[in-house]
Amino acid sequence: MASSADVYVFGDQSTPVLDKLQALVRVKDNALLTSFLGEAFLAVRREIVSLSSLERKSIPEAESLSLLLEGVRRSEPHAALDSAFVCIYEIGYYIDYLARSDKQHPPAAPSLLLGICTGSIAAAAVSCAKDVFEISRLGVEAATVAFRLGMHVRRRAENLGYSTPSSWSMILSSNQEELVSEALKEFSKEKNLTYSSRPYISATGPGFTTISGPPSILESVKSCDTFSGKRLYPAPIYGPYHNSSSYSESSLEHGLASILEDVGFLENEMLIPIISCASGSRLDQLSFGNLLKNVLSSALSQQIRMDLVTDALVETVSGTEATLIPVNAQTTVCSLADWLAKRGATTRIGPTLESLTKDRAEPNLAPGDENKIAIIGFSGRFPEADNLDEFWDLLIRGLDVHKPVPEERFARDHYDPTGQRKNTSQVQYGCWLKSAGYFDTQFFHMSPKEAMQTDPAQRLALLTAYEALEMAGVVPDRTPSTQRNRVGVYYGTTSNDWGEVNSSQDVDTYYIPGANRAFIPGRVNYFFKFTGPSIAVDTACSSSLAAINLAITSLKNRDCDTAIAGGTNVMTNPDNFAGLDRGHFLSRTGNCKAFDDGADGYCRADGIGTLILKRLPDAIADSDPIFGVILGAHTNHSAESVSITRPLADAQEYLFKKLLNETGIHPHDVSYVEMHGTGTQAGDAVEMRSVLNSFAFDHSRPRDKSLYLGSVKANVGHAESASGVLAIIKVLLMMQKNTIPPHCGIKTKINQGFPKDLDHRGVRIALKDSVDWSRPEGGKRRVLVNNFSAAGGNTSLLLEDGPAVHPARQHQDGDARTEHVVAVSARSTKALEENLKALEAYIANSWAPEGELLSQLSYTTTARRVHHSRRVAFVTNGLDDLRKSLLKAATDAGQVKGIPAVSPKVGFLFTGQGAQETAMAIGYYKSFSSFRSDIHQLDSIATLQGLPSVLPLIHGTTPVEDLSAVVVQLGTCIIQISLARFWISLGITPQYVIGHSLGEYAALQIAGVLSVNDAIFLCGHRAALLDKKCTAYTHGMVAVKAAADDLRQHISSDLKVEIACVNGAEDTVLSGPNADIESLCGKLTQAGYKLHKLEIPFAFHSSQVDPILDDLEELASQVGFHEPKLPIVSPLLRTLLTGDTLGPQYIRRHCRETVDFLGAIKMAESQGIMDRSGMCIEIGAHPILTRMVKSIIGQDFRCLASLRRKEDHFKTLADSLCALHLAGFSVNWDEYHRDFASSRNVLQLPKYSWQLANYWMQYKYSWCLTKGDAPVENGPVGAVVQARALRLSDSVHNVIEQVHGDKRSSITVESDMHDPSLLAIAQNHRVNGLTMAPSTLFADIAFTLAKHLIQNHGLDTHTNLPSINNMAVEKALIVGETGPQLFRASLDMDWTTMRGSVRIFSVGANGKQTTLHAVCDVAVENPSSHRESWQSNAYLIQRGIKQLVQGASDGSAHMMRRGLLYKIFSNSVQYGSAFQGIEQVWFDSEGLEGTGKVFMPSGKDTFALNPYCCDSLGHITGFIMNCSDSLDLDDHVYINHGWRTLRLVEPYQCDVQYQTYVKMQAVGSDDSTYSGDVHVLRDGKIIGICGGVTFKKVARKVLEMLLPKPSGAKAKHGVVKHVAPEPVKHVVLTPPSTTSHSVGTTSPPEPTESPVGSASGLIQKALEIIADEIGVDISQLTDTTLLADLGVDSLMSLTILGNFREELDLDIPAAQFYEFSTVQDLKSFLGANDQDFSSSNSEAESSASSAASTSPSDHGDDVVEEVKPVVAEIPRSTSTILQGTKHCSQTLFLFPDGAGSATSYVTLPSISSDMRVIGLNSPYLTKPHEFNCALQDITGSYLNEVRRRQPQGPYHLAGWSAGGVSAFDAARQLVSEGEVVESLILIDSPNPVGLGKLPKRMYDFLEKSGIFGAFEMGEEAQAPPDWLFQHFCVFIEALDRYVPEPFEHGMAPKTTIIWAADGVCKNPDDPRPEAQPDDPRGMNWLLNNREDFGPNGWDEFIGAGNISTMAIENANHFTMMREPIASALCAKIRETMGVN
């Protein structure tokens, strides 16, 4: 029997593989295949990312091979992807073929491989693979090579001018090679084709010939006589393959070298011979590298000769039975079999993969690096440690940081040592974060209001995630593994403390997203825009390690490429302490006593930890820092335990051994175990047993391989859901520090239940001192981290050291760059300053070599940092210089402005002649591989055209003056094209180009007009024509500093001198014969002109070039001119070039005519292409054009250089990149650093300098202790529950809250201005007709609060008396006509300083501040010290009083009595009799000095500091200032602005005679401000001083504007009904903690209001609205503040705009508001519109205007509802004014669609200037989880809000989508109640009957299509909050249940239905979800084009006669709501409502 041989035939890209490769991807039972396909995709993706940004645009983005295949299917063919897909498919096919057949690899029987074209690459990988596993590894390398080959061919096609993919080959079904060859030669000659355009024969064989060439040429070939009538089939080959004329030997060698660069396994030897498809020869005994060179050379430059292949196979298989096995080559194999059979060979065709039916055998993959996970960054917050350094410090010092529960968490009354009281615990200790509430709201774009409601765990997860990413140097989208859609977030979290006890006390908008645990990872995803998995894990104590385990699994399964993983635990809920204590988990004596014999439970702890994880190969490829490597992680459960909470040794032991076995690690190679170690008797014993059984089961462990045990819980407690990640971070720090810290858990003696032979087993515990733990030489340390859960779960993780030397830097040279860019950025000025100082300090403390440190600093701060809006950057060559620059920049940080929202325009300027030099661009050539590759590629094109190589110009081997014009000019062009490409590769893409003279060739190429091939052809052959037809140096050019018009007057007719270039207003170049030039130069010199002769051989743009023009035009006719891809500014035509103006004639004129650079730049400036804010980069040897451009546009126009003479190119490049970065461009820093491997080390620089403030919502009143108690006995349901109030005085009516501690105390009180005692004060004090509280009332309140706290603190009130200092009245407290009118006061007292601060403010119905009235300070002082010092000066005061009294007698002073005095006073202040305490006054009008007698009769009041008396004692100052004839008082008054100090040695009393004295003195040089000290005397002794009483001059008109008219007083406050006083809670604080109540420290006082009728008043009001809405002090709204940084998102913007319309009558379109990026932008707009505002606000606005976005408390409704029994009430709907103001004549109400928010309508343009448009919000908008009622049930809530806005009809209602159904139901209810609905508008609202619920696949489709779920905000689409989508889902549920009721006959309103004409999938080829049988009607209605524009079922409910319909063309359901179609919609609405 004849022997057999297998011939595997690998096909080329002519056979489609997309579907077949997709089928392979779906194979799930071949692990090796799956692994190969995944790795091959990653390899291809790395190649894609390495391309320039321009090249990447042609490749669809995808996160998997499957998605990439789908993307390619919908896009144009791509040669690189085609080539790679063929290779991947064929290798995958071969792998799967082996698994499904009986074949082996290497094959047992004789075998051959045959690869056709690109199929040879796959064949090469198979040939050189030693086993099936190596096929996968070599296959990945082959895929890389195939992609590069295809990219090489694509670039050649583009260089030839063919960028649009079309077929480059067609097959003639006959073998007539000679005939075809002759025909093609004749064709090329006839068409005058250049070599690169000529068609050629690329393949021949029995029965076929393949003709290849440019697509447009092939089309012409078809019409040749030779091929007329013959069948030519196009082949899917998209580039010039198999073309020998395209390559010289050197260019081919260079091309192969670039393709094979860094390819692995090149030394592998062939195991299976290959038949060459080019020669038919047998290839064997070659290395993989040489084999690839052979097959690549064949694919690029050699014909396919299937005739020779057939000959070779006949010879090879002779005498054997050959089996031809097709691998993507079924057609080829059939043809081969036929050809062989005709030659007598015996062959058969083997089975295909599809025909095999054997079961698949799944190979086991050997463990390797691809299964390892690198930890590349980590961060955390730890008990008593805010950063990693502090954490390590407490570890190494062996500290135990447990402490009592801080007061800010919960009160001490939750502790009960007896354990008898309900809900208490006997535990009083924990381990606590120092700064749990601190957060940087501006950085994370979160408003303080939202931050306050957001769980600190969420906020700290954000902070630590950013820090860990920064540590890792992760820049999103930098590499394939950091694409945003490939980053997953996994956090373990088990408690919900914040939502349970803190934010639940005041449930508001952000309660759900702020408190729900799922938002912890979700918040990280959302902020960073990571769209990978977002998963919260709860496995109790092991949550964080379980989350990390899940992240590792996701990485291995390629669900993501980068994982952010960790855990959080912030304890605020006392119930958890109580529950764990009563469950016997917790220690009552302190911290976790791990390994101690007296272990009695665990100590609870806070903790946050975050890790950044990647697959190890990805981390190495990305040059990431690697701090540790995870070998494996697993989780199981102790299900067999006796109790669910009791750990099981067997389960843990199984887990440990499973890890060791799977990772191949010997137990003795593990040197440290980080134990769970909670310090419980059961847990410690079980864990020790399982660890010893696994790692030290006997005494065989070598002495030099000790096993150390430890537990971080002994230091920082048990952080529960964060405990695992904290343990890992401890281990990572140990690896960094090479030290095992001491274990502090053993307080008495080691657990006696542990085995006694630990020492013999080699087990150690570092007890007192730290232990050296250095990495073994050439080895790795390995660690087990163990974590188990109270719920029975066990998770363990095995990790080891990372690579000792990063593989990317193993074979590195030093960084050759002499100058480096170092960048620093921040999001705020203060952060920028601190970042700069921190970096300087880091450098100062570094010991690294200067060159290495500088290089790596540059890499880290540019390529590995996210760059923020405030930027500074430096170009430096030394550390000293850099440190000085950093400190200088820190000082000047306040001057740094944010980068513009849109980067400025940038253009490329291409220099002309005259700048060339020897060794031009040599620095770039040597330093940057991409530039060097482009030079070689372009040079090879030139040499193939018969032109000389330009490399001598670059290498500098020949001086430039000795080089030919061809080399110089062509070299300039090639260098410029390469430089431009280099800039583009750095991320700088030009928006326009300008070429000066010679430079225009490169400009035309970069703009896409000329292919690279044609640009080289024209430029090179033009220069050759010059050499041939012109004589060098017979003509010259001279630059003259003069205007062209002036020079024309000097050029006589006998001189053949012409103007060659007009470079500027006084910058002109002349050209002509040398003699004429010399003659003219003499004249010009005599005339005083400055000139400079240019050293060039030829004078372009002169008569010298006339001989070449015809030939040049003929050459130009041979090339193709394409439409420009970007604007080209033409100096020839002084206009923008278009396809019509470009052609051979243009090239001719360009050579000969004048270069009007001046005219071109002016034109570009006039058309907005160039402007002063823009930038340009000069592409040339020296920035010659820069000077010209600046002289035309202005010196501030920024021009950057690529090269400068006599300047290191590194400095030039660095300077330019630095400038671009600072201008806001996203520089591709990775590309900049790519060629400098030694720099690619991520330094561990100081972390970002957060600007933190404390956002803490205090848990109050210990209400957890009373949960479940019977309610306090109430009266009838709904009655007010009157709790006993604590009234301190007649000014302090009710104590709301007081907290007393050793170091701090605080109190908050509430009073009613309509209480008789306070109302009397205000009614006796009227200013400008307004009833107003005096400032002395505020002083009394402050005095009262201070005395109360002094008494409660146990101090003697006789020796500790408060002084009231720095009183500042911010806004008058005006009393309304009706009450109650509540205001509050708070005092925070610091007993360490005996100082406190007071705030007095009005409150709304919800108890929240509405207006701040006054602030002051309190100081507790001993009055005796004042009495002594005052008495020493009393004689001076008494002498002054005496002189004034005597002066009244001698005429030098005046005396006045009470009646006249207060009558004069009444001009400004009307005092009632109760305030008229002055009996007599003596005063010196000119000296502003006075004294008075004051007597106040006694009353029944209980004031601490009687305001009547206090005010009267101060009247002397007001009288002196406003009754003086020495001051200008005709048009001005002097207003009291507070005082500096008010000190008493005894309280004021009634029925006592006082004497007052004051002398007022000017402050400053003018009369605007006066100040004085009021002395109060009793019986001649000073008993009080009011110091620094200040009056300021105010115009009477301004005063009238500042103070509202009395008629408006009615609206000055909200009417608040009485509520039950809250019980007073006394909280005892344990030192040294303090109580934190609010944001940061005391808020600064609010600024005084500006007049509202002015621009500044408008701005002030607007800023107050914004500040109030986002919850910040108005002082934070600085001009440079970014609104987005404050959390002003789309939803908040809607509310703010509504408030503007309601309170300010200011209508700003939403789209315009979104354009305001900073506060200054808004202020500029408001300043420009102040006139409109002023005219519409003639009356002063109320200080308590109702908010535009309303809530229940805004309505003044009785808040007693809070104590009603809980019933299923519908929450109130809210609304926002979207358009118009209250003055509009009509109002249109828009009902929300399914999302529930009015934001759906914000994109509508103005409907009418006379229409107010109000958008309603769903009552369940932010709490969709509560939406469980019917749709018609919420209609009443909507109507309540409609009636609040418009109490009576007629009404106009409308709604889009599902909102139309709500509008219909509302209209029906209104009509049934007798109201008039004038119009109902249904905007593309389907009839709800039978609509059906949309399936999730529909949502996914809409979201993926970018249709659903994005809200346009400015130019950026922002995703809405998660609850918006949740609301949509629950609303659709309600809509599905809704059964509409028809209107009663004759009652339906006029109804208009406006339909969109199109479906979402308008065109047949539009993507659409796959149809399913259960697709609901609503789904088809959305997707398909509409055909019926009638009522569509609505007539059943409204009546056909009441309905009119309209349709909007070219609009679908979604696009109709956005511009430009929204304008058409608004026009339809106007038409319907009959408005203009």
Curated annotation (Swiss-Prot):
Q: In which pathway does it act?
A: Secondary metabolite biosynthesis
Q: Which SMART domains match?
A: PKS_AT, PKS_KS, PKS_PP
**What's the protein name?**
Bikaverin polyketide synthase bik1
In which organism is this protein found?
Answer: Gibberella fujikuroi (strain CBS 195.34 / IMI 58289 / NRRL A-6831)
The EC category is: transferase
* Gene Ontology terms for molecular function: 3-oxoacyl-[acyl-carrier-protein] synthase activity; fatty acid synthase activity; phosphopantetheine binding
Q: Where is this region: C-terminal hotdog fold?
A: 1452-1600
User: What is written about domains in the entry's comments?
Assistant: Multidomain protein; including a starter unit:ACP transacylase (SAT) that selects the starter unit; a ketosynthase (KS) that catalyzes repeated decarboxylative condensation to elongate the polyketide back- bone; a malonyl-CoA:ACP transacylase (MAT) that selects and transfers the extender unit malonyl-CoA; a product template (PT) domain that controls the immediate cyclization regioselectivity of the reactive polyketide backbone; and an acyl-carrier protein (ACP) that serves as the tether of the growing and completed polyketide via its phosphopantetheinyl arm.
Q: Give every PKS/mFAS DH domain span.
A: 1293-1600
Q: Which residues form the Ketosynthase family 3 (KS3) domain?
A: 370-801
